[in-house]
Structures are given as C-alpha cells and as structure tokens.
C-alpha cells in the first residue's frame, strides 16, 4: 500500500464471529451445527489484528462505491484487508446468489435452495469494476448443483464482461469444482481469466468431514486441468481446523504436483457458533515456516499469514507469479503488470 498522500492509520479487529457471519435464518440447524454450537466462540490471540492505513486510493474507491451504490464481498464480509486491497484498486465480487447448494463447515455462506440465476449479473459486475476503476477483480461464487451446468456460464460470462468493459483490468476467477467435468471447466479456460483458482482448503484426513460435497482428489484434478489448459493456477489452505504440520506440508506438495502455481495459507476464523470450532491458533512463526516450505516446493507465488485470504492482494501476487514463471504476458495486461511492479511490494497482513 502506498502511504503517501492523505492517510490515517487504524487498528482493525476481525468481527467476533469471523468475517461477516450470516444469520442462520429460518433453516433448522443440522445436528452437526447443534454440536458445534455447544462450543463457545474462541477468544482470538493478540496477533489476530489488522493494522490498516487509509490512503488516497482507498478513499477514491470508497467514494465511487457509495456514489454508485455498488456491492462487494470486501464490504459485506467486513474484511479487515479492505483498506489495503482497495488502496491497490482490487476488490472481490460474489456471484450466483446468496445460497449455496453445498455446506462446508468453515464457510460463512448459508446453505439452501438458491434463487433463479440472475442472467444480468455478469454485466453488472463488469459495470461495477469499471465504475470503481479497479485494475484487478477477483470473482467467486456459490456452488449451484441445482443447475445442469453448475452455473459455469455465469462464471465465464462474468470474466468476459469484465474484459469487455475494462480491457486493461485483470480477472481472477475462484470456482467451485463443477464436479470436475472437463466440458464445463473448458468454458472457464476459453474465457481466459488471468488466474484460475480452486481452493482445496484442507488436508485429506479431515477433508470429507469439513467439505463433504467435495473430494480432495477431484479438487486436485480441477487444478491439473487448469494447468494443462495453460492457466496460471491458484489454491488456498486454511489452518487451525485439526490438521497436523506434516499434513500441511504434504498438501502443499500435492498442490504443486497437481500444477498449482500460487498458494495462500491462512488461519481459520470461525464465522458463527454453528460452524466448526477452531482447533488451534497458528502462530506467526509457523506461517513463516510454511511460506518457506512452499517456496522450496516450487510455488511461483506464496502468501501466508493469519489474516491472509485467497483474494488478498491477488493482483500483486499474480504479477509476481507471472514474473517468476517468465511466461509471455498478453498485450492486454502488460501495462497493468508494469503498474503493479512499480508499486510498494510489501504485504501488510502476510508474514
């Protein structure tokens, strides 16, 4: 983040129930959720605190969002990294609705029957990126197993709309697994996002308990298909859900073997009492060690830290990965790469 100009510093404490915990609504709690809720929300350690600088670019983006009545995940989730990402003119958007057809025990998005697909949403997201004058947008969404194509058209069309309305901006797409079907993933590849991301989130031993609708091997294959299609690939690991250090190291090796270029490593923050209790708080020194391991394993981009999220400073991490991999840079984003490289290189929330 650029500290020049009119800026002020604030301490940001993540919300007590995680990043923007949802209301359970009228849905009856599952037995698992009842069991989870018997464990009180854990007190966060002193190092789970974001130190933010409110700079000039952040204020400009904030004014545009307010004036145009735009919506971003950054705001609605109360993300403590918003100050730094917006200062870099980066933001994250959620598509496909507010209800997911799958339930992961760490995830704040509610599970239920989704509304009909909003076919105008891709165009509105593209307009938002243009109005906010973003240079890099991350797009993620809910699983839509209620649809024959899993909602893949919506993801691909959103990439196309952002490229159309903001030809100089980068797009990172964070997808569900679309059941690993090559014909569906091909639609994402053809839309040509700058980064193709799918998060494995945790290790094999506890994967099924935490992500019952996903499969570890299938998630790795989703990443492999992206790598074979020539994508820059990315994934995320959440720590503090019951994994061991050896399992984390092996998961990093699995990701690299699958063709993953970029990895982010973060601390689990419990969204609400009905979610999985925190197994442990990973100390900053451990994140440093995991970061070094990931670099040694061969990832071209690594960010690790308690408040790192998969979309945190995504444009900066992409630019670093492109440079490290020495891949050919498309003409459309060469100017963007140069802009990013000229900026400050530090990541405030990473170790």
Curated annotation (Swiss-Prot):
Localisation per UniProt entry: Cytoplasm
EC primary class: transferase
UniProt feature, compositional bias: Polar residues: 1-10
Keyword check for Iron-sulfur: yes
Cofactor: [4Fe-4S] cluster
SMART domains: Elp3 (SM00729)
Bias (Low complexity): 14-24
Pfam families listed in its UniProt record: LIAS_N (PF16881), Radical_SAM (PF04055)
Record's cofactor remark: Binds 2 [4Fe-4S] clusters per subunit. One cluster is coordinated with 3 cysteines and an exchangeable S-adenosyl-L-methionine.
Cited CDD domains: Radical_SAM
Binding positions ([4Fe-4S] cluster 2): 100, 104, 107
Covalent S-S links between cysteines: none
Keywords per UniProt: 4Fe-4S, Cytoplasm, Iron, Iron-sulfur, Metal-binding, S-adenosyl-L-methionine, Transferase
HAMAP family: Lipoyl_synth (MF_00206)
Name of the protein in its database record: Lipoyl synthase
Gene this protein is translated from: lipA
């Amino acid at each position: 983040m650029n500290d020049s100009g009119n800026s002020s510093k604030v301490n940001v404490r993540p919300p007590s129930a995680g990043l923007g915990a949802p209301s359970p609504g009228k849905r009856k709690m599952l037995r698992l959720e009842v069991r989870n809720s018997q464990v009180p929300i854990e007190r966060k350690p002193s190092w789970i605190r974001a130190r933010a600088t409110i700079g000039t670019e952040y204020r400009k983006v904030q004014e545009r969002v307010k004036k145009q009545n735009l919506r971003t995940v950054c705001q609605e989730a109360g993300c403590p990294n918003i100050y730094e990402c917006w200062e870099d003119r980066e933001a994250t958007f959620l598509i496909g609705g507010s209800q997911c057809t799958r339930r992961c025990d760490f995830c704040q998005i509610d599970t239920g029957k989704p509304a009909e697909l909003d076919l105008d949403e891709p165009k509105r997201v593209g307009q938002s990126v243009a109005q906010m004058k973003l240079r890099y947008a991350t797009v993620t969404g809910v699983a839509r197993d209620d649809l024959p194509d899993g909602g893949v058209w919506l993801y691909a069309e959103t990439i196309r709309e952002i490229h159309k309305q903001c030809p100089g901006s980068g797009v990172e797409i964070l997808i569900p697994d679309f059941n690993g079907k090559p014909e569906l993933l091909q639609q994402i590849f053809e839309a040509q996002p700058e980064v193709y991301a799918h998060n494995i989130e945790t290790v094999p031993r506890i994967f099924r308990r935490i992500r019952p609708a996903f499969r570890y091997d299938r998630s790795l294959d989703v990443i492999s298909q992206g790598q074979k299609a020539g994508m820059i690939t990315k994934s995320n690991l959440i720590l503090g859900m019951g994994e061991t250090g050896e399992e984390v190291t092996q998961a990093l090796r699995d990701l690299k073997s699958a063709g993953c270029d970029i990895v982010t490593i973060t601390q689990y923050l419990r969204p609400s009492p009905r979610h999985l209790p925190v197994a442990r708080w990973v100390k900053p020194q451990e994140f440093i060690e995991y970061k070094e391991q990931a670099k040694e394993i061969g990832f071209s981009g690594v960010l690790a830290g308690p408040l790192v999220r998969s979309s945190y400073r995504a444009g900066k991490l992409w630019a670093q990965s492109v440079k490290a991999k020495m891949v050919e840079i498309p003409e459309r984003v060469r100017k963007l790469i140069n802009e990013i490289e000229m900026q400050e290189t530090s990541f405030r929330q990473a170790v």
